[in-house]
Amino acid sequence: MSDDMALPLQFTDAAANKVKDLIADEENPNLRLRVYITGGGCSGFQYGFTFDDAMNEGDMTIEKQGVALVIDPMSLQYLVGGCVDYTEGLEGSRFIVTNPNAKSTCGCGSSFSI
């Protein structure tokens, strides 16, 4: 899709650039960044990120700058309208999710409740 606004989940340039760098370090061009939701964390749900070279039935792929972000259907329902970004700061560097569906988030931003 060429229109980023039509996508159910946004993927920033900063996140795409970092994924591209990490994939280059792994020397496996088939890797994709998988974003998923699991139960846990201090708020009930938590975000997870992992590299994956497999696609599962129902996975959605969002491509940007030659790299792919993959989301399973169960996680996607909690992430619609959100944005995956990459930040570097005093707290370290990490991927973060801005999620309009979250009613509350923990202080570090890695878990949320609905």
From Swiss-Prot:
Gene3D superfamilies: HesB-like domain (2.60.300.12). InterPro entries: FeS_biogenesis, FeS_cluster_insertion, FeS_cluster_insertion_CS, FeS_cluster_insertion_RrpA, HesB-like_dom_sf. Its cofactor is iron-sulfur cluster. PROSITE patterns: HESB. GO terms for cellular component: cytosol. Iron-sulfur cluster binds at residues 42, 106, 108. Binds 1 iron-sulfur cluster per subunit. Homodimer. Belongs to the HesB/IscA family. This is Iron-sulfur cluster insertion protein ErpA. It comes from Proteus mirabilis (strain HI4320). The gene is erpA.
